[in-house]
From Swiss-Prot:
Function per UniProt: F(1)F(0) ATP synthase produces ATP from ADP in the presence of a proton or sodium gradient. F-type ATPases consist of two structural domains, F(1) containing the extramembraneous catalytic core and F(0) containing the membrane proton channel, linked together by a central stalk and a peripheral stalk. During catalysis, ATP synthesis in the catalytic domain of F(1) is coupled via a rotary mechanism of the central stalk subunits to proton translocation.
Protein name in UniProt: ATP synthase subunit b
PANTHER family per record: ATP SYNTHASE SUBUNIT B (PTHR33445:SF1), ATP SYNTHASE SUBUNIT B', CHLOROPLASTIC (PTHR33445)
Any one GO molecular-function label of the UniProt entry: proton-transporting ATP synthase activity, rotational mechanism
Any single GO CC term annotated in Swiss-Prot or TrEMBL for this entry: proton-transporting ATP synthase complex
Amino acid sequence: MSVNASTLVADNLADAASLEGLPENVSAGHAAAGTEEHHVDPTALGMTATAWVSLAMVIVILLLLWKKVPSVIGASLDKKIASIRANLDEAAALRADAEKLKAEYEAKAKAAAKEAEEMLAHARSEAEAIVSQARVDATALIERRGKMAEDKIAAAERGAVAEVRAKAASAAAAAAGALIAERNNAKADKALIDGAIDALGNARF
C-alpha cells in the first residue's frame, strides 16, 4: 500500500508540474529566471506552498486510508442505519400491536354494548311480563275475594231468613197453641181425640 501511495504522490506532482508548463526536475526559481516580471513564489525543498498543501492533503488521505477510517466511518454509519432501521421496525411493530389492541378493544366494547342492550331488553320484557301477570293475578284475586264476600253475604242472608222463619214459625205455633187452648176445654179435646181415633179406624178398614 505504501508503494502505491508513493506512486500516487509522484504522479500528482508530475501532473502539477506539467500543468504549470515546467519540467519535472526544474524548480520555480529556474523557471522565473527567463523574465523579470514573473512573480516567484517562495519554495521549500524545491516545492511551492501549493505543492506542499497538495502533498499534505494526499498524505492525510493516505493516512485515513491506511487507518481504514472510511471503513470505520462506513461501519459506524451502517451500524447507525441498522439501529435506526431496527427502531423503525420496532416502532412499526408497536404501532401494529397498538392497532390490534385498539381493534380488539373496540370489538369487545361493541360486544359489551350489544350484550348490555340485550340484557336491558330482556329485563324490560321480564318486567312487563311480571307486571302483566301481577295484574291478571290481582284481577283474579279481586274476583275470588268478591265471590267469597258475595257467598258469605248470601249465606248470612239465608241464615237470617231461616232464623226469622224459625222464629216466626215458633211464634205462630205458640200463638196457635195459645189460641187452641183458649178456645177448647177438656171435653172438647176428648171429643176431638175420639173423632180422630174413629177416623183412623175407618181409614184402616
